[in-house]
Amino acid sequence: MDDRDDSSYARAPEPDDLIRICRSLNDAGARYVLIGGFALIAHGATRFTKDIDLLIDDSPDNVARVKRALSILADNAAADVQDTDIREHVVVRVADEVVIDLMGRACGLSYTEVAADAEQRQLGDALVPVASPATLIRTKDTYRPQDAIDRAFLEDLIKRRQSPEA
């Protein structure tokens, strides 16, 4: 195993890392949606995350765009991702200076389904497609304690958005 495949060598991503990566994805014309912890943070949650979760269009052309975009990272670990990996594996972990988890589906939801109601969020100088709160709830349907906390936050956010005072 190559050292760059070991996520213990990566550091926790910071907001500036996310912005830089999303800017590069946008410049490459990659089709992606931010999910996971950073999506919750983009919606106002206060939480820690140790990786960047991206739901991507798993077509070979788009995988090539994502790999090109992620080549800005120090170790270019994304170069090891094969065109079919996203379709063949639940999660493809790119352990570079930060860890990025690439998925073609999240809890049964495809990129196309999630992108349909994604919200565009301005994060720094990058316009980022972020999974909607309703979609994020569907991706948090697990038994992990953090997912229960995230679901409660998202349900409250949806209620606040539907409130007349919102």
Put a short name on every predicted segment.
Residues 1-166:
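Compositionally biased terminal segments of proteins
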